[in-house]
From Swiss-Prot:
It comes from Paracoccus denitrificans (strain Pd 1222). Disulfide bonds: none annotated. The lineage of its organism: Bacteria, Pseudomonadati, Pseudomonadota, Alphaproteobacteria, Rhodobacterales. This is UPF0301 protein Pden_0436. Belongs to the UPF0301 (AlgH) family. Pfam families: DUF179. GO terms for cellular component: cytosol.
Length: 190
């Protein structure tokens, strides 16, 4: 794969007619993309049945009076019991081995210590916690894009970290100048 086709740090926007109901009207941030496959987090599927404070309690983390309440979302169907914190991380901040830099100013963390920081009212902002992730094998994502399953766009932090999950899919399409009502689920290839 050449560097120009690398989608790390980009967003995927599900096309109408997405065959997999787990990804219907999904917006996904691609966290890693290489010849070995791809990994991303769905950013617009809230998990209303579990709040951040509930999750802290389940993990035995005591929330302080100044605890931050970050959104908890369905990140994807792979490893749904594993948490991934997507957060700002300015370039000048050194990341440890359990944190992965996605772009110059965005990282993903999988450590308990970041959850403890949020429980104390610390931690990077904006942030979101995703349970599970979306994964693709070698060439699989590229094939799904060619088959008209996904649109790609530059990252939009207002879409990723914005408050209204229900409108994120439409907002992502509109950021590309696309009216969702004008999209066809069928692709044409010459």
């Amino acid at each position: 794969m050449d560097q120009s086709s690398n989608l790390t740090g980009k967003m995927l926007i599900a096309m109408p007619g997405m065959r997999d109901p787990r990804f219907e009207q999904s917006v996904i941030l691609i966290c890693a993309h290489s010849e070995d496959g791809a990994m991303g987090l769905v950013v617009n599927r809230p998990l209303p049945e579990i709040g951040f404070s509930d999750l802290l309690a389940q993990l035995g983390i005591q929330a302080g009076a100044n605890a931050l309440d970050i959104p908890v979302r369905f990140g994807g169907p792979v490893e749904p019991g594993r948490g991934f914190v997507l957060h700002r991380a300015p370039r000048e901040i050194e990341l440890d081995e359990n944190r992965m830099r996605i772009t110059d100013d965005l990282a993903m963390s999988t450590t308990r210590d970041i959850l403890e920081d949020f429980a104390r009212g610390l931690g990077p902002q904006p942030a979101m916690l995703a349970l599970g992730y979306a994964g693709w094998g070698p060439g699989q994502l590229d094939s799904e894009i060619r088959e008209n399953g996904w649109l790609t766009s530059d990252r939009g932090d207002e879409i990723i970290f914005g408050a209204e999950d229900a409108g994120k899919w439409r907002a992502a399409l509109k950021s590309l100048g696309i009216d969702p009502l004008m999209l066809s689920p069928d692709a044409g290839h010459a």
